[in-house]
Amino acid sequence: TIENGRDDLAVRRIINVPKRGIGATTINRVQEYANTEDMSFYDALRVAGTIPGVGKSVAKLDGFVQMIQTMRSKQPYYSVKELIEDVLEQTEYRKELMSEGTEEALDRLANIDELLNKAASYAEHADNPSLGGFLEEVALVADIDNLEEDADHVVMMTLHSAKGLEFP
């Protein structure tokens, strides 16, 4: 969302992580408004005060939008790792996962550490490191990791997406 507010699915996935008390009804009303006005979900959040039926949730939605705007303003000055660390600090996501204490929460904490390591490595090796470039690289690796090695099919990709990958 910091990089691309037009990715409605991504915005909807993070709007309540960690929990912000924004209910499904509010999210659905914002989505309906976005669809009616032919705008992105994030753009609809930015004008939440004008959406009928949102009511008391406006303050929570405004807080979310303000956080994203603040992160966007820091983007040119922060490394990818610093930006991720700032998001974690501002949202208190790590704190929430630690208090959960479940196996899944511990796995997520380990994933966060791995993401931070990848961000640091990306900054060292990329010619012109950016959040967009990092997200593209991480998405590429995730796609390749999800491939089944023993599956009986051909995998096609662009030359751009194959850059930096190794094949047997």
Q: What are the roles of these predicted feature ranges?
A:
Residues 1-168:
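Conserved helicase C-terminal RecA-like lobe
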